Amino acid sequence: MRTLKIILSAIVIVICLGLVTFAGILLFSALPREKSDQPETSVSTDPPVQEETPAETPSEPEASAPDAPTDPEVPADTPEEPEQSEDTADELAGHTARIQNYLAGMTLDEKIWQLFFTTPESLTGVTTATQAGDTTKAALAERPVGGLCYFAANLVDADQTRTMLQNTQSYAKTPLFLGVDEEGGRVSRAGSNPAMGVTHFEAAAVYGERADMAEVYQVGSTLAQELGALGFNLDFAPVADVVTNPNNTEIGDRSYSSDPQVAGAMVSAMVDGLQRGNMVSCLKHFPGHGSTETDTHEGKSVSNRTLEELQGCEWVPFQAGIDKGAAMVMLSHLTNENLSDLPSDLSPEVVSHLREDLGFQGIIITDSHQMGAITDYYDSGEAAVLALQAGVDMILMPMDLQAAFNGVKAAVEAGTLTEARIDESVTRILTVKYGFGILNLSD
């Protein structure tokens, strides 16, 4: 986190002095941004505001929203942002040069593999991965992916998980994102197993009802500590969706609130808690999955929310998380017909809104490409290429990992994807890994 803020704070100096190359400028444009120096971990409230949109729970189609947060103040016992020294332009150029030098030393194949965030089963071919040994070592040498995502079946107990993740990381030439879905509530891969030693927090909607930013900050901070102790460095959380449809079961209580301002405050606090603990956070599922009734795990899901509605509601929590410095955003598979005819994670228009309208310059990742909204219409190679052409940086869990890699490499060789486009995404990936201390680049 310190490195990310240092690099960002010196952008203007670097540009003015002309010390970076075009590649360096691309790097800086990719950095996640944090606008607040203090953790917003408490919230004062006004009288309840009656919302016109439905509440998030199907059994209560018309409910008033919780008190909206206004002018949050940091309590005295909340950890304050440590003072950071300013890097000189020369030091900043050194950060840039290290990343660019590392990128220059990678082969095309190595760079393409970095774009994939898969499961240990997909990587190795085993049925259920609960350990990492020679098979994992050989698989990572052949297919050096950018990240691995673990599920409850992989996590037997704390000691087993810690050993598995330590071994896995030791086999990687370029250090891996080691990720898990730990939202709380019904999506708690580690917390749902008492043997893991990870706190099983309540669903996001419970915290949204209380609208206590300090409490949510502590949830993020605790998860960062507990997951980090196991070897994880990325949490696919928080959910930044605003549930505006009471019949939405895919998101439901995974959302903090049907009030975008409350949801935004909670998302900001969760991102802050996670990332101050050096855990990469991932906002999901842009451009917002709270208005739908159908499940993209099963097939196509369509939203008819207008751009104005999205800007005034669904995008408020995403903007709050981005402003707090979230390093990654996940795109959903839903098709918003007012934005694009394509699933969101294959849509240049959706990526453009995220980059330009919301100012996000970190890693954009797809939702799982094993879900019906993708597999019913695209093969693995086609979906991966379309996502990268749209401007996405990482492909999550392609149905056929090798076919996805082959499709991307063939597209580069054919000129429908350029190596410069690949480099752009890999630079973002390396930058986040470097900034969070996952990738160590010494002089």
What residue spans do the PLM features occupy?
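A substrate-binding/cap region within the structured catalytic cores of diverse enzymes
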Residues: 202-271, 275
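Flexible glycine-/small-residue-enriched beta->alpha junction loops
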Residues: 190-207
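Extracytoplasmic
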Residues: 111-115, 143, 163, 171-173, ...
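Flexible hinge/switch segments at interdomain interfaces of large molecular machines
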Residues: 239-245, 286-290, 443
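Short acidic, glycine-rich surface-loop motifs adjacent to enzyme active sites
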Residues: 113, 136-157, 236, 246, ...
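Second-shell residues forming the walls of enzyme active-site clefts
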Residues: 107, 125-128, 132, 157-172, ...
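Preference for extracellular/luminal or secreted protein segments
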Residues: 2-54, 60-62, 67, 71-76, ...
